[in-house]
Amino acid sequence: MLVLVGLAGAGAAVGALSRYGIMRLALPLNRWPLPIATLFINLTGALLLGWILTSSLPPNWQIFLGTGIMGGYTTFSTMINELVLLGRNHHQRVAWEYFGLSLVGGLVMVYLGTLI
């Protein structure tokens, strides 16, 4: 059990560092109200998670990659915070578009990931 916790924790660190790197690279895109970086991260994470969960990888690898890396990489809380900020800054239409793209796009990406 401790090994599994260690695998998930190590993976989460890798995922969080990857997310941080992408967020930093996307800083020039901040001139648009749509949070492109978080949307990209969550959609690519959903695609990869779909693949991981239906792959024939050993359980330890699924925990490291799925629970760990994808858990640290994707970010529901940042998405919710960005939705609130969009609403507060009078970008309600963009907030609804972002919500729809995140929800429907995430489901589509998970499905596509299962086909890989």
From Swiss-Prot:
Na(+) binds at G71, T74. GO terms for biological process: cellular detoxification of fluoride. It catalyses: fluoride(in) = fluoride(out). It is a multi-pass membrane protein. It holds the Pfam family CRCB. One of its GO terms (molecular function) is fluoride channel activity. It comes from the Bacteria. The keyword Membrane applies. The keyword Transmembrane helix applies. Its main location: membrane. Belongs to the fluoride channel Fluc/FEX (TC 1.A.43) family. This is Fluoride-specific ion channel FluC 1. The gene is fluC1.
